[in-house]
Amino acid sequence: MMLITTSHRPTRRTRSFGHDLERVFPNSLYMTRGKKTIQELLMEAYDRGYERLLIINVWKGNPLKMTFIKVHPDDWGYLGYLYLHGVKLQREMGFRGLNPIREDMPLVVTTAKRVGLDHLAFAQVFSELTTGKFVPRGDKSLLSIADKYNTDVLAVIERHPRGIVVNFYRLDVTKERAVGPLINVKIWIMEDGRRWDYKEAFGIKVKPRRKEGEAEEGARKDSH
C-alpha cells in the first residue's frame, strides 16, 4: 500500500503517529527518514512494491501536514495534502502495541451515517490518496461493509466542529469502537485543483493579513 515516513528530525509524537498509521494501512511500512531525500524515498518505496509515499510534516512538535506522493519510476508526482488541526494517537484511545496488518486486504473508506456532501467528497479524496476502496455508507453497518469487501480495517469520515475527522477501525482487534489514530483535517488540497477549507465551509471570516509596508507603519505607530 504505502511507505510512511516523516520530515527530517521528527518529534516522538510524530513518529508515534507514523507507527499508528502503519497499523491501519494494510501492507504498509513506517520507516525512519534519516538523511534520505525524496528521490531516495521514492526508490525505496518502488523497490518494496508500494504505490504511495506518505510524508508527515511537523509543526511545534505535532503532525501538521500529510503529503501523499504517487510512486512510479517514470511518472511519480505529488497527489495531495492534508493539513491537520491535530491527531489522537492509538495509545490515547486505549490501544497499545497493535500489530501491523501484513496481508493483502483493502482499506475501505466510508463515512458515518449522517454526514454532508463535504464528508462524502473527502471520503472519495482520501481513498484516492491512500489507494483505498471508497464505499458509500447508506444504512449499512461497518460490519456488513467489512464482510462484503473481506477486510478488517476501515477508515470512517466523521463530523467534527473544527473540520472533518478520519477515524480507523480494526475489526480483528475490536468490533465495538475505533482504535485510532483519529485525524482532524482542517484543509485538504489535491494537485488537480480540488480543495476544501473548514473556515470557508463553515463561513468563518479570516482577518486579512496586512501588507508588509502597512505592518511596518502600524508598528511605528504602536511604538509612539
From Swiss-Prot:
**Which superkingdom does the taxonomy of this entry point to?**
Archaea
The UniProt keyword set, sorted, is: Ribosome biogenesis
Q: Where's the Brix domain?
A: 1-196
Q: SUPFAM superfamilies recorded for this chain?
A: Class II aaRS ABD-related
GO terms (molecular function) for this protein are:
rRNA primary transcript binding
Q: Does the keyword Chloroplast apply?
A: no
Q: Name one GO biological process term.
A: rRNA processing
Task: Extract the HAMAP family matched here.
Answer: BriX (MF_00699)
Q: What does this protein do?
A: Probably involved in the biogenesis of the ribosome.
PANTHER family assigned: U3 SMALL NUCLEOLAR RIBONUCLEOPROTEIN PROTEIN IMP4
Q: Which NCBIfam families match?
A: PRK03972.1
The name under which this protein is listed is Probable Brix domain-containing ribosomal biogenesis protein
